[in-house]
């Protein structure tokens, strides 16, 4: 095998990054010879907004049952992409977030980065003027949040923030 294709016409960079991360972990586990639990990896993929999974075009001539003509909308009730890390203040331990969807103090979020993922509760939020606010209002805004101690983001240009729902 030389490549894997992530299907979908309208997948965001968040979707592609998260899917590639799960695929990489699954490939590494399979190649190492350890017990391979595909349900663990599918559970991680199920957290992403999707229209359900089918065999798609795995086979050359696909029966209609293997295509998804029913659900035209991706949905997810577990996680939501809420922002992109734009810079990190290492002295203070805070990150500047370009907000994509609303989140608030107390929310459980997952920081996805090239160095690995970290789950934590948002303890505080500051707006662009450094004023403490209860929530990041939504797309088009920038806020700062404190990072967990000893956070290693790898390359922060590729770090994203996801909120856990329910």
What are the residue ranges of the model-derived segments?
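Surface-exposed amphipathic alpha-helical tracts and adjacent flexible/coil segments at the periphery
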Residues: 1-166
């Amino acid at each position: 095998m030389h490549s894997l294709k992530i299907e979908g016409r309208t997948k965001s960079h968040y979707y592609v990054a998260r899917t590639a991360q799960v695929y990489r972990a699954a490939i590494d586990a399979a190649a190492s010879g350890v017990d391979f639990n595909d349900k663990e990896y599918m559970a991680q993929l199920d957290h992403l907004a999707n229209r359900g999974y089918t065999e798609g075009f795995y086979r050359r001539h696909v029966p209609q049952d293997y295509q998804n003509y029913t659900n035209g909308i991706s949905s997810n009730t577990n996680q939501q992409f809420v922002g992109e890390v734009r810079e990190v203040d290492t002295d203070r331990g805070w990150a500047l977030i370009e907000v994509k969807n609303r989140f608030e103090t107390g929310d459980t979020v997952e920081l996805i980065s090239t160095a690995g993922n970290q789950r934590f509760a948002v303890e505080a939020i500051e707006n662009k003027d450094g004023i403490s606010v209860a929530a990041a209002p939504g797309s088009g805004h920038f806020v700062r949040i404190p990072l967990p101690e000893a956070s290693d983001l790898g390359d922060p240009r590729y770090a994203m923030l996801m909120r856990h729902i329910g």
